[in-house]
């Protein structure tokens, strides 16, 4: 089984790193709490006059590279490989890609090892990537093709209005994926 894992928000903890960076840069302006997020694009949760400040944080040199792993993500990645799954990291770089693309590779190398960089797929359109499952926090994924993969939503406050697909986090992933493996054998 070919499992595609999104990077930011699924493997790399974009959200909490952003909040920490916001507090350091703008201690006088309260950041939007993760639990209160409504939009997949973090800048959209801020007032128009603050969106440039938000964008400056996540496009800054080193931000993507230095993201901490989501708790449990590295262990789940390694366990899936040990179970014989073909696991790939399928990530969309930011439109402001100057730092992002290289830093995604550096993040994978730092947390999963140099060999894992060969498992990294960067694309603006995930519907063009082949796979059986895509685990992604983006609530709706559209593109040029009808994807072959089944979208499993990685749980986040901004995607909880989507109830038509399986949902997981790194605490319950075994149960959710066991159901998907059973389904694929049927």
UniProtKB/Swiss-Prot annotation:
Q: What Pfam families does this protein's entry cite?
A: NT5C
Sorted alphabetically, the keyword list is: Hydrolase, Magnesium, Metal-binding
EC identifiers of the protein: 3.1.3.-
Its GO biological process annotations read: pyrimidine deoxyribonucleotide catabolic process
GO molecular function terms here? 5'-nucleotidase activity; metal ion binding
Give residues annotated as binding Mg(2+): 6, 8, 137
Q: Which residues form the active site?
A: 6, 8
User: Could you say which cofactors this protein requires?
Assistant: Mg(2+)
The organism's place on the tree of life at top rank: Bacteria
Question: What task does this protein carry out?
Answer: Dephosphorylates the 5' and 2'(3')-phosphates of deoxyribonucleotides.
Query: Which family, according to UniProt?
Result: Belongs to the 5'(3')-deoxyribonucleotidase family.
**Protein name per UniProt:** Putative 5'(3')-deoxyribonucleotidase
């Amino acid at each position: 089984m070919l499992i595609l894992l999104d990077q930011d928000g699924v493997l790399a903890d974009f959200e909490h790193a952003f909040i920490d960076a916001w507090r350091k840069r703008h201690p006088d302006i309260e950041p939007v709490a993760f639990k209160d997020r409504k939009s997949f694009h973090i800048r959209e949760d801020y007032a128009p006059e603050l969106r440039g400040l938000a964008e400056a944080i996540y496009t800054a040199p080193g931000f993507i590279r230095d993201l901490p792993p989501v708790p449990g993500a590295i262990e789940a990645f390694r366990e899936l490989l040990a179970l014989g799954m073909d696991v790939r990291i399928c990530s969309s770089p930011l439109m402001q890609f100057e730092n992002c693309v290289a830093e995604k590779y550096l993040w994978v190398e730092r947390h999963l090892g140099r060999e894992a960089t060969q498992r990294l797929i960067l694309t603006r359109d995930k519907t063009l990537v082949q796979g059986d499952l895509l685990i992604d926090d983006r609530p709706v994924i559209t593109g040029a093709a009808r994807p072959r993969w089944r979208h499993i939503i990685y749980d986040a406050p901004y995607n909880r209005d989507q109830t038509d697909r399986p949902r997981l986090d790194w605490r319950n992933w075994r149960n959710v994926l066991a159901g998907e493996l059973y389904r694929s054998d049927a």
